[in-house]
Amino acid sequence: MRNALAAVITGLMAVSMAGCGEGEGEGDDAFTVGLLLPSSAVPRWERFDKPMIEKRVKALCPDCKVAYANAADDATIQRQQMNSLITRGARAIIVDAVDVKALRSSVQAADRAHVPVVAYDRLAEGPVSGFVSFDGAQVGRLQGKALLKAMGDKAKQRRIVMMNGDPVSPNTAWYRKGARSVLDDKVTIRKEYANLEWRTDIARGNMTAAISDLGPGRIDGVLAANDAIASGVISALKSAGVSPLLPVTGQGADLDAVQRIVKGEQTMTVYKSFRQEADVAASMAVALGHGRSVHAIATTTVDSPTTQDVPAVLLTPVPVTAGTIERTLVRDEVYSIHEICPANLRSACDRAGLTGPTTKDTKETKEKEKVKGGDPGGVPARAGVARHLQAVRRRPGAPGRGTATPGR
């Protein structure tokens, strides 16, 4: 089945990359940017990252094209996609690696072909030219602090289960390190699990095993690394008859997770602005495609196991609880209140204060405010990206500041 899937996806990839053939995009103002995303199962990639990157590339380089492919969580397929982009003449590639180690040889091949690679969300190994992600340690710290607050004094022993992400991802260790910096000496970690491919079903099985081994009355909270894992944890708690549900963290701001927060089933999620990350990645790729340095965009440098001082932008994650959904996700137009609050959640949304205007109303209000000479409700991230782009136009490359080491 895997071989069949690989054949199908490779065929579709060839069609989607047809505009990236040899001889195209050779002019200074017209070239192809490759975009490789890791999964079709996680909602954000197709709904947010892909269209936002495509839109931003077009805004920065009207004659450029984006050749897109999704690896469907298969590292072998992603290597094939990467190699195809190199062969077909992409001038820059944005890639979120399924497996950062497995992709190393393809990153090296891109370097030999003088095709710069921007690592997106996860730091791929090999000679990448730029990296954009969120501060993973801060993600973990936000989760740890939220879990401690939710458990409060009622859980004096603070016995938790720690549900980490896929060990293949360097971000998993990054998140865990941040969480442990907050939780160590304040909780007892009774069980700890790796959840392959961040899968909900695996998380549910692991949590079911933890409940069986420990007993539901001997767990006070669950540190879940992302929303897919949180979904599996909460499903297992419900199946075991745990009531009230335990505090459970998350990450990703998936719509179903936001709705669980509204219902009181999930404690929080960590929001990482899709638009902000997409804008920086597109800016880096277009700059590199034009033969310019990304040092003017980068705000720091990072080290991978293979490459030191990679120019990077590490963005700031934001915690989201029931009381902050409107001023984060709704304000940033990730979701409208109408999307978050179907009829069966209307009363819960009212309790959470989600009674404001729809996305359409919000957009109309913002347009009126812009006409009046301001946009006080605008997204701060956009201003930050604008400053990056102004820097690219105004000044030559300069070395990044500081050093971080994600995924070690």
Q: Which functions belong to the PLM regions below?
A:
Residues 15-19:
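C-terminal motif of bacterial Sec signal peptides marking the signal peptidase cleavage site
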Residues 1-10:
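N-terminal export and membrane-targeting signals
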Residues 20-408:
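A residue-level marker of the well-folded mature domains of exported/periplasmic proteins
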